[in-house]
């Protein structure tokens, strides 16, 4: 059972992304008004805006939290061709009494020549690493060699994907059997490149990332992509938001010999495909146990998907943009562009039409 709670986000333009921190008690929103807002859940159960500041000179597409092991750190990316890293500084006590916190810019990453469309921190077992992707098809991986000095970031890898990148997702598996892996989605609408999703894997021998797989069946623009938490599986599960919702299974094929080099080859299977949104799907997000997938689309609804014991995926719930449950089909309402699931219990939705500048919260 989900109960809706509306948040007057007070953004002056469209909300593009909503992101929870690791514990699900802080969230960040970003908007075309060029700002980022940070929200904290109080003891009263209400969400309070504790910081709001202009971050970029263009629309802010994405915002994401680092693992709390590295402190209170955010990254954002923008149409202004940059990504930025922000750190919260403990301010004076009177600021805390007013419920405000200070965030300062630690660095600006300026390598991209086009809009930076997504930004993600790598899984914490890899250290403090940050990945960006750009509309010109380049994925960049940065590392902070000293986690105590977030003003210094070195560019470790540049991956040319040859497609207009729109979204990225790290494989969260920390198993030594799985090399670091990143999925990249593209949203160019031309048919020059048939496969709009690529899987790149780190090669220990060459110390570079190489393309391991292209999902050739994904031919429409991809808006979001998300690896499921691994939880000891021998295969990987990848959710994709395109003109519908798709869930893929990537099963690593056994290498011919232990000494064989080159990226892993995968057997790619479609686990599920849903066109229930009857429209473009903008966000997909897993819960922490990878048992529940949430998707949001232009039909103005969030849909929840769950697999039964036979591994058949079915819709287990539909929520409108205002948080009300849907019985049966629903007509279009405000288009939803952002959905995040920090755990099994919470979900956040950002409304993405000019008339929708609120964030909608559904705690379970």
From Swiss-Prot:
Name of the featured protein: Nucleoporin SEH1
Tree of life domain: Eukaryota
Subunit composition and interactions: Component of the Nup107-160 subcomplex of the nuclear pore complex (NPC). The Nup107-160 subcomplex includes NUP160, NUP133, NUP107, NUP98, NUP85, NUP43, NUP37, SEH1 and SEC13. Component of the GATOR2 subcomplex, composed of MIOS, SEC13, SEH1L, WDR24 and WDR59. The GATOR2 complex interacts with CASTOR1 and CASTOR2; the interaction is negatively regulated by arginine. The GATOR2 complex interacts with SESN1, SESN2 and SESN3; the interaction is negatively regulated by amino acids.
Notes on how activity is controlled: The GATOR2 complex is negatively regulated by the upstream amino acid sensors CASTOR1 and SESN2, which sequester the GATOR2 complex in absence of amino acids. In the presence of abundant amino acids, GATOR2 is released from CASTOR1 and SESN2 and activated.
Keyword check for Protein transport: yes
Gene this protein is translated from: seh1l
Source organism phylogeny: Eukaryota, Metazoa, Chordata, Craniata, Vertebrata
Record family assignment: Belongs to the WD repeat SEC13 family.
Keyword annotations: Cell cycle, Cell division, Centromere, Chromosome, Chromosome partition, Kinetochore, Lysosome, Membrane, Mitosis, mRNA transport, Nuclear pore complex, Nucleus, Protein transport, Repeat, Translocation, Transport, WD repeat
Main localization of the protein described in the UniProt heading: nucleus
